[in-house]
């Protein structure tokens, strides 16, 4: 689960992590009022959406007087902000964060995330903040520190010293940053985060460090332990189809291809997407119906994937272990009763009650269903139908 910058900064502040003063605004008048209340002569007017790259997309502006605050707020609030993370459709800006300015002398990058390959928590830091970290890693890898932390040991001074060394900090600056990272690491672990990112982390003329941006992502499976975090969910930022799918126990992620996938099990779903790509076609979604799929959930899955007008073929790939293939077959029939399906359906069913499922489909008189003998054959059929 993702949260907004203003929410992340409130959590930071509650845990002793330095942030600049700021207030959320839901209208232009409130934005101006917030700037007045914050005081000063410079403010950042920031769009609040669940995506990075807001500045490049025109969603972050620096105002040097209250008239500029009003002007920028009126332009950003209500805009459809498109960034490299939103796709061309963009996201509607419904709230702003008005933040006090600071005398910035240096920008850094700092993130804490789970490194699955190394089975460690990893701190990533760079002296090149405010930039695309992937670009920095490619062009100037020596400017990035990657420090692995064994969760059983936790964050120690030597971890922080390595970060300070790569960032080129002096002794006093290093002490301040290490203290800040220690608090961030504790927060990351205590709140079951997947990722914590500050880009940029700034150093002021006074030698102090502040989180100028804040991005936090939480493990959905651990939210039951953190009701105060779960309350921060903004469903307007989530894909409506993905949200609806989750309500029916379906794991759905929309992609930009033309082959809709319906699979049971995340591993098989990813393998199905891989072989579709390998065949020369492109998957339109990730969709895991899970082990307890019923005819009703399969019908709902059909309804969701058919809303995507880019879909030309549906590929159903089911291995009946926990889920029974006949349930999937009945779900297909249920779906075709309620939703008009005018595109080809390639079906590969194997495992529990596969023979019964084949009989159900054979007796259904559905003319647009094609049976695949195995996964490779299914991908080949899909590619031939897409063209």
From Swiss-Prot:
<keyword id="KW-0479">Metal-binding</keyword>
<dbReference type="InterPro" id="IPR016102">
    <property type="entry name" value="Succinyl-CoA_synth-like"/>
</dbReference>
<dbReference type="InterPro" id="IPR005811">
    <property type="entry name" value="SUCC_ACL_C"/>
</dbReference>
<dbReference type="GO" id="GO:0042709">
    <property type="term" value="C:succinate-CoA ligase complex"/>
</dbReference>
<keyword id="KW-0460">Magnesium</keyword>
<dbReference type="InterPro" id="IPR013815">
    <property type="entry name" value="ATP_grasp_subdomain_1"/>
</dbReference>
<feature type="binding site">
    <location>
        <position position="99"/>
    </location>
    <ligand>
        <name>ATP</name>
    </ligand>
</feature>
<comment type="function">
    <text>Succinyl-CoA synthetase functions in the citric acid cycle (TCA), coupling the hydrolysis of succinyl-CoA to the synthesis of either ATP or GTP and thus represents the only step of substrate-level phosphorylation in the TCA. The beta subunit provides nucleotide specificity of the enzyme and binds the substrate succinate, while the binding sites for coenzyme A and phosphate are found in the alpha subunit.</text>
</comment>
<feature type="binding site">
    <location>
        <position position="199"/>
    </location>
    <ligand>
        <name>Mg(2+)</name>
    </ligand>
</feature>
<keyword id="KW-0816">Tricarboxylic acid cycle</keyword>
<comment type="similarity">
    <text>Belongs to the succinate/malate CoA ligase beta subunit family.</text>
</comment>
<dbReference type="Pfam" id="PF00549">
    <property type="entry name" value="Ligase_CoA"/>
</dbReference>
<feature type="binding site">
    <location>
        <position position="46"/>
    </location>
    <ligand>
        <name>ATP</name>
    </ligand>
</feature>
<dbReference type="GO" id="GO:0006104">
    <property type="term" value="P:succinyl-CoA metabolic process"/>
</dbReference>
<feature type="binding site">
    <location>
        <position position="102"/>
    </location>
    <ligand>
        <name>ATP</name>
    </ligand>
</feature>
<keyword id="KW-0067">ATP-binding</keyword>
<keyword id="KW-0436">Ligase</keyword>
<dbReference type="InterPro" id="IPR005809">
    <property type="entry name" value="Succ_CoA_ligase-like_bsu"/>
</dbReference>
<dbReference type="GO" id="GO:0004776">
    <property type="term" value="F:succinate-CoA ligase (GDP-forming) activity"/>
</dbReference>
<keyword id="KW-0547">Nucleotide-binding</keyword>
<dbReference type="GO" id="GO:0005524">
    <property type="term" value="F:ATP binding"/>
</dbReference>
<dbReference type="GO" id="GO:0004775">
    <property type="term" value="F:succinate-CoA ligase (ADP-forming) activity"/>
</dbReference>
<feature type="binding site">
    <location>
        <position position="107"/>
    </location>
    <ligand>
        <name>ATP</name>
    </ligand>
</feature>
<protein>
    <recommendedName>
        <fullName>Succinate--CoA ligase [ADP-forming] subunit beta</fullName>
        <ecNumber>6.2.1.5</ecNumber>
    </recommendedName>
</protein>
<comment type="subunit">
    <text>Heterotetramer of two alpha and two beta subunits.</text>
</comment>
<dbReference type="GO" id="GO:0000287">
    <property type="term" value="F:magnesium ion binding"/>
</dbReference>
<comment type="pathway">
    <text>Carbohydrate metabolism; tricarboxylic acid cycle; succinate from succinyl-CoA (ligase route): step 1/1.</text>
</comment>
<feature type="binding site">
    <location>
        <begin position="321"/>
        <end position="323"/>
    </location>
    <ligand>
        <name>substrate</name>
    </ligand>
</feature>
<dbReference type="GO" id="GO:0006099">
    <property type="term" value="P:tricarboxylic acid cycle"/>
</dbReference>
<feature type="binding site">
    <location>
        <begin position="53"/>
        <end position="55"/>
    </location>
    <ligand>
        <name>ATP</name>
    </ligand>
</feature>
<dbReference type="Pfam" id="PF08442">
    <property type="entry name" value="ATP-grasp_2"/>
</dbReference>
<feature type="binding site">
    <location>
        <position position="213"/>
    </location>
    <ligand>
        <name>Mg(2+)</name>
    </ligand>
</feature>
<dbReference type="InterPro" id="IPR013650">
    <property type="entry name" value="ATP-grasp_succ-CoA_synth-type"/>
</dbReference>
<dbReference type="InterPro" id="IPR017866">
    <property type="entry name" value="Succ-CoA_synthase_bsu_CS"/>
</dbReference>
<dbReference type="GO" id="GO:0005829">
    <property type="term" value="C:cytosol"/>
</dbReference>
<feature type="binding site">
    <location>
        <position position="264"/>
    </location>
    <ligand>
        <name>substrate</name>
    </ligand>
</feature>
<feature type="domain" description="ATP-grasp">
    <location>
        <begin position="9"/>
        <end position="244"/>
    </location>
</feature>
